[in-house]
């Protein structure tokens, strides 16, 4: 059985389409890609998260738990009340 791991920064738009770029890309790189493809910004309805190695999109909080279980991070980075994952925490 393969251990779930966080593989890529991703953004899900209002229609549910997921845009992702492999590491070491960050979420701003994904947003730039979306802009290049003509996706109109509506950040209030976009979800920033990650793609897992099984292809599933998860939000930042879910990704933090996956990364912790997979040993990709040693603890959930709780600073300034942050309990979610940033790409900077991984790569």
Where would I find each of the regions flagged by the language model?
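Linear-motif-rich, low-complexity cytosolic tails and juxtamembrane regions
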Residues: 1-47, 52-91
